Regions:
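Catalytic beta/alpha-barrel core
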Residues: 43-49, 70-78, 95-105, 126
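Extended, intrinsically disordered, low-complexity segments
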Residues: 1-17, 28-29, 240-241, 246-300
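Glycine-rich, proline-tolerant flexible connector loops at the mouths of alpha/beta enzymes
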Residues: 35-73, 166-174, 178
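Acidic (Asp/Glu)-rich catalytic clusters
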Residues: 35-36, 65-66, 86-93, 109-121, ...
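Alpha-helix-loop-beta-strand connector modules within alpha/beta enzyme cores
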Residues: 52-93, 180-198
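Catalytic alpha/beta core domains of metabolic enzymes, predominantly
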Residues: 117-269
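Active-site mouth loops of central-metabolism enzymes
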Residues: 3-29, 53, 99-105, 131-136, ...
């Protein structure tokens, strides 16, 4: 699974201050560190960037590309800022990617022409006019709308990254939303027949938002394995999470097989396996809604 480094984010105090002060050093140091950590893309997250977003994105893109060749995700709702970044982006190892275009007319009409103009990739986000889709079927409907727009604007499948939207396991809707993301991925191969070459991505760490910090890694790792089983090609992640990096590169196959067995409905007694394996069994059951989430799920 490809990794998109999420760390260059305006919400990180040090980075936000550096952006505000136009101080290149912290930004370049972080970009170099992400590249050394082996990420396949670096996400530049400016947030809303309503005031001066165009000038800021142009400066950050130039600043980052002075020191690394890693392709960039341009992450903001400000279309003007995205275009400003694309104007100065230098294609070294791949196209820049617009993160993201929602399945809403105002987003599609504004950003698809920009993507086509600059030969940029797009994250096609399954967020529709009514907000978050309720289930896998609604995700499929929104995906079809976004794919149609890609075809209209000549965006090749290889430049399209479908994001089904990962939601927190701690949310009230988790028993529907967390499994429905998996269900959507089961139909993804059929969608790829409509737009060959299209791949998928997600904000993986969203699944553990709201969980105690020490429990977030196992949620992220387990959900990564579950999504990857059905073709999830990439994820926006912490570039410096070494354990997650191992899972993304296919490490720990014995845990992967165990997770798949639980997904397939096998009842595995946690007492019959090691403590580590039992934790992954329990976590998988929570993520497929066979057990309720609580902060003490590993202790039950």
């Amino acid at each position: 699974m490809l990794r998109v480094g999420e760390n260059l984010n305006v919400m990180v105090k040090k980075i936000g201050t550096a952006m505000k002060d136009r101080d290149p050093k912290p930004i370049q140091e972080l970009a170099i560190a992400e590249a050394k950590a082996g990420v396949d893309f670096i996400d530049i997250n400016l947030g809303p960037a309503r005031k001066g977003g165009g000038e800021l994105m142009e400066w950050v893109v130039k600043t980052v590309q002075e020191v690394v060749d890693t392709p960039l995700y341009l992450d903001t709702i400000n279309a003007e800022a995205i275009e400003a970044g694309l104007k100065v982006y230098k294609k070294k190892k791949g196209n820049a990617v617009i993160n993201s275009i929602m399945a809403r007319p105002e987003s599609m009409d504004l950003k698809f022409p920009i993507a086509a103009k600059y030969n940029a990739g797009v994250v096609a986000l399954l967020w529709g006019p009514s907000g978050l889709p309720r289930d896998a079927d609604e995700r499929g409907v929104l995906a079809a709308e976004l794919m149609q727009k890609c075809l209209e604007f000549g965006i090749p499948g290889e430049d399209v990254w479908m994001d089904p939207i990962v939601t927190p396991v701690t949310s009230p809707q988790s028993q529907v939303q967390v499994p429905s993301c998996i269900e959507f991925m089961k139909m993804f191969k059929d969608l790829q027949e409509i737009l060959p070459g299209m791949r998928s991505t997600c904000g993986l760490s969203n699944v553990s938002n709201g969980a105690p910090e020490h429990l977030r890694p196992i949620l992220n790792q387990t959900y990564m394995m579950m999504l990857e089983r059905f073709g999830m090609a990439s994820a926006i992640v912490d570039a410096f999470d070494e354990d997650l990096k191992k899972f993304a590169s296919g490490g720990r196959p014995e845990l992967r097989k165990l997770v798949y067995r639980v997904m397939d409905g096998e009842e595995i007694d946690p007492k019959s396996v090691s403590k580590e394996e039992a934790d992954y069994v329990k976590t998988t059951r929570v993520l497929i809604a066979k057990a309720l989430y609580s902060d003490s799920w590993l202790e039950l």
